[in-house]
Amino acid sequence: MQYRDLRDFIRGLEQRGELKRIQVPISPVLEMTEVCDRTLRAKGPALLFEKPTGFDIPVLGNLFGTPERVAMGMGAESVEELREIGKLLAFLKEPEPPKGLKDAWSKLPIFKKVVSMAPKVVKDAVCQEVVVEGDDVDLGQLPIQHCWPGDVAPLITWGLTVTRGPNKDRQNLGIYRQQVIGRNKVIMRWLSHRGGALDYREWCEKNPGQPFPVAVALGADPATILGAVTPVPDTLSEYAFAGLLRGNRTELVKCRGSNLQVPATAEIILEGVIHPGEMAPEGPYGDHTGYYNEVDSFPVFTVERITHRQKPIYHSTYTGRPPDEPAILGVALNEVFVPILQKQFPEIVDFYLPPEGCSYRMAVVTMKKQYPGHAKRVMLGVWSFLRQFMYTKFVIVTDDDINARDWNDVIWAITTRMDPKRDTVMIDNTPIDYLDFASPVSGLGSKMGLDATHKWPGETTREWGRVIVKDEAVTRRIDELWDQLGID
């Protein structure tokens, strides 16, 4: 089922028993985090806090707190269906030339559907029903969460940041946390390789000293939100991909103060600029690692205008030691990644990002090994093929008789098929997440690959052990007798 906007999604979740309205006053300061954390760990529903303490605007939390709700937001009926979305993205990322006329005709509907999902620009939008400008702008009117005791200030977490570089026709959508430092100022924490930061850098080079337009959409429809965190090919905009997920074109509206276009059905829009050179220290904040991050300097976003729907809903989350909402998103999006990787590396059978590994810092790959050194080729491919795995510190590669999602299997493979010196690959001075304080230098560290596959001639001179396999006939006979044995 597809959802036109966030409110439509809320109604759909409520009908399925997947959303709970909270009538008891709960504070955005620490209390919402506690409630959402307990609910997420219990695999509970999305939560709509209708009476946040001190505010008139309700807060939506734990929206994507289960993989099933992520799938629903992407228009799928099950997590397994996300593999089909991954296959579509794999095709669009590297489309193969048609093998003949029949093949060309079979692929034509896909391209026609993609073209037909180009965003639609509208003149009037519900996200601009109310306009607040100038001195009336006050972020303190929004129920922005203060998530952890050691956090320095309230933090905007689910904002879709919209930017456009000076040499680009296409806008970039990114989700970057934003620390509130005044009634109309937040710190835009984007890492240097992310799309928004690249757009800003190019703008400063081409338009030195000129303010850089930025917009932030809060409470967009689920397809647009999830499109911003999915590995969409560079040839496809996040808005067009959201249209594919939703089944109809994404409606956009021009900002009141710039040429940027924002989701027309969003709940709240922040419009403004970044003045080149205006920076501020950001943090510390509790993060998805389970630790408070270091303080670092990032650009300041000045909010010149807030537009919103009548009676808006504020969408929020928290990040902390897994499981948290980003970790659950990672579990679901894992299914999207698998077909994309298999398109490039057909030998890959499964790919798993354990959520306890902070969603991306460790990957387990199972493969059909075909030659000596094959596992090392795959691990290097994982690090280099998709930018989403640039910060993956550990890659474990095993044979296809191992279940990548079962640590009992994986640890058995590591301890029985690896020699630590021969089968460990270490790479120095590679890009590492800036939040990773374990690396010796901020943003630069090492990576480890573990080859836990059976070793082929050339990789070892010893006779390799044979895996114990039960006798199938005996297993069937004992299955038939089992109830008679009286063993509980």
From Swiss-Prot:
Its main location: membrane. Pfam families: UbiD (PF01977), UbiD_C (PF20696), UbiD_N (PF20695). Keywords: Cell membrane, Decarboxylase, Flavoprotein, FMN, Lyase, Manganese, Membrane, Metal-binding, Ubiquinone biosynthesis. The active site is at 287 (proton donor). One of its GO terms (cellular component) is plasma membrane. It is a peripheral membrane protein. Its EC number is 4.1.1.98. Mn(2+) binds at residues 172, 238. GO terms for biological process: ubiquinone biosynthetic process. It is an enzyme of class 4 (lyase). Pathway: Cofactor biosynthesis; ubiquinone biosynthesis. It catalyses: a 4-hydroxy-3-(all-trans-polyprenyl)benzoate + H(+) = a 2-(all-trans-polyprenyl)phenol + CO2. It is found in: Cell membrane. Binds 1 prenylated FMN per subunit. Its cofactor is prenylated FMN; Mn(2+). GO terms for molecular function: 3-octaprenyl-4-hydroxybenzoate carboxy-lyase activity; metal ion binding. InterPro entries: UbiD, UbiD-like_C, UbiD-like_N, UbiD_bacteria, UbiD_Rift_dom. Prenylated FMN binds at residues 175-177, 189-191, 194-195. Homohexamer. Catalyzes the decarboxylation of 3-octaprenyl-4-hydroxy benzoate to 2-octaprenylphenol, an intermediate step in ubiquinone biosynthesis. Belongs to the UbiD family. PANTHER family: 3-OCTAPRENYL-4-HYDROXYBENZOATE CARBOXY-LYASE-RELATED (PTHR30108), FERULIC ACID DECARBOXYLASE 1 (PTHR30108:SF17). This is 3-octaprenyl-4-hydroxybenzoate carboxy-lyase. It comes from Pseudomonas putida (strain W619). The gene is ubiD.
